Swiss-Prot record:
Cofactors required: K(+)
UniProt name for this protein: tRNA modification GTPase MnmE
Main location: cytoplasm
GO molecular function: GTP binding; GTPase activity; metal ion binding
EC numbers for this chain: 3.6.-.-
Top-level enzyme category: hydrolase
Binding residues for GTP: 224-229, 243-249, 268-271
Complexes and interactors: Homodimer. Heterotetramer of two MnmE and two MnmG subunits.
Source species, domain of life: Bacteria
Chain positions recorded as Mg(2+) binding sites: 228, 249
Organism this protein belongs to: Actinobacillus succinogenes (strain ATCC 55618 / DSM 22257 / CCUG 43843 / 130Z)
Keyword field contains Lipoprotein: no
Length: 452
């Protein structure tokens, strides 16, 4: 028999309204015990909430939702009373006196909604993301995920893969039917379409992950280029020590900031040069480790340094060591000394921003550039939010699609193509929860609020 669970749905502490939520087969029994009568589904009732001996604990609104027409798909009772924590604790204690009712685990209401097919896994995760959203756009994107936008894109991919699997496996299982998919250009065409479609979803998911988790921006460059001054300017405080001595920063410095609500992880690193000092060499090694994991790199150049007036050499030396997939923005700092005008230009495929970290002139240009790099939009449009596990699943699916394409075009191996397509379907289905381990479900829902 399914269990009946209860939890406080509003935050712990004082408030105007406090809500307790009950879900499960005993929800109607709890209603009779607390308000003294059966409740008509989907009608608000203003009633006293009573203790076991009949004394009134509080009075408020009682709502009953009958299975399957509820958030969890089970019978649900909501008691909306006053928001004092003592009153809510007394009412919670009263509900737990009903035999068979227990406290809910974190995220258990959403888990029940998932298990009862009221939500898929990506939609359930979007509930927590909507609650935790730190900007208007993150909230709108989480809502789109909750409404199924991400899931619909994934399901379209799954449908395409299933179609291919059906075609390929039929040809393998029934060779007498003369379905020669190896010589059929349509199958390769469909496979290419799915690969392109998946890449578009991966790109959107990457942007959605940045909205949720923040973009990691690493400030890199030669010593004394003004990296620490730029960190301080973006952070709005003296987070890093700044001196005229080259090599002042020996270790990695991190600051978490928001630009119009968009989360940003700014990382200041040691100046890049051939160092003889052991401590500085360690700092430079750590700097490159951070650079290789960045979502974007700000390459700092000292515009007052004669060498930086020909930045191609500095840039080429740096880019030669940088992974090609990491975007780079070039910052020409110290315009107050060089006399260059603050502004943004496009040069040789790079965005170049001229500013002075010391005087803060041009910093707003950099802030706007970072916002746009993160996908900031002022309107109501926006994509979906994505989590790291979603990106991992999409990456694995993309890998097996590429392998399947090789099996088809180079080796004409039908059985191996079918197996790669099976793996693609499995990884995509992990996102929505069609094929998901119990351990993964436990980890996901345990991070939710109690009462959600």
């Amino acid at each position: 028999m399914k269990e009946t669970i209860v939890a406080q749905a509003t935050p712990i502490g004082r408030g105007g309204v406090g809500i307790l939520r009950v879900s499960g087969p005993l929800a109607a029994d709890v209603a009779k015990a607390v308000v003294g009568k059966a409740l008509k589904p989907r009608f608000a009732n203003y009633l006293p909430f009573k203790d076991e001996d009949g004394t009134t604990l509080d009075q408020g609104i009682a709502l009953f939702f009958q299975s399957p027409n509820s958030f969890t798909g089970e019978d649900i009772l909501e008691l909306q009373g006053h928001g004092g924590q003592v009153v809510l604790d007394l009412l919670l204690k009263r509900i737990l006196q009903v035999n068979g009712v227990r406290l809910a685990r974190p995220g258990e209401f959403s888990e029940q909604a998932f298990l009862n097919d009221k939500l898929d896994l990506a939609q359930a995760e979007a509930i927590a993301d909507l609650i935790d959203a730190s900007s208007e756009q993150a909230a709108r994107s989480a809502l789109k995920s909750l409404q199924g936008e991400f899931s619909n894109k994934v399901n379209q991919l799954v449908d395409g893969v299933i179609y291919l699997r059906t075609y390929v496996e039929a040809a393998i299982d029934f060779p007498d039917e003369e379905i020669d998919f190896l010589a059929d250009g349509k199958i390769e065409g469909h496979l290419n379409d799915i690969i392109a479609q998946l890449e578009r979803v991966r790109s959107e998911a990457k942007q959605g992950s940045i909205l949720r988790e923040g973009m990691k921006v690493v400030i890199a460059g030669r010593p004394n280029a003004g990296k620490s001054s730029l960190l301080n300017a973006l952070a709005g405080r003296e987070a890093a020590i700044v001196t005229d001595i080259a090599g002042t920063t020996r270790d990695v410095l991190r600051e978490h900031i928001h630009i119009d609500g968009m989360p940003l992880h700014i990382i200041d690193t040691a100046g890049l040069r051939d160092a003889t000092d052991e401590v500085e060499r360690i700092g430079i090694t750590r700097a490159w480790n951070e650079i290789e994991q960045a979502d974007r790199v700000l390459l700092m150049l000292d515009s007052s340094d004669p060498d930086s007036r020909q930045p191609e050499k500095v840039r080429s030396e740096f880019l030669a060591k940088l992974p090609s997939h990491i975007p780079v923005t070039i910052i020409r700092n110290k315009t107050d000394l060089s006399g260059e005008n603050e502004g943004v230009t496009q040069e040789n495929g790079f965005t170049v921003i001229r500013l002075s970290a010391q005087t803060r002139q041009g910093i707003d240009l950099l802030r706007e550039h970072l916002k746009q790099s993160m996908g900031y939009q002022t309107g109501t449009e926006g994509g979906f939010l994505a989590r790291r596990r979603h990106l991992d699943a999409l990456e694995k699916a993309a890998y097996h699609l590429r392998q399947g394409h090789i099996q088809l075009t180079e080796f004409r191996a039908g059985e191996l193509l079918a197996e790669e397509l099976r793996m693609v379907q499995s990884h995509l289905s992990e996102i929505t929860g069609q094929f998901t381990s119990d351990d993964l479900l436990s980890n996901i829902f345990s991070s939710f609020c109690i009462g959600k």
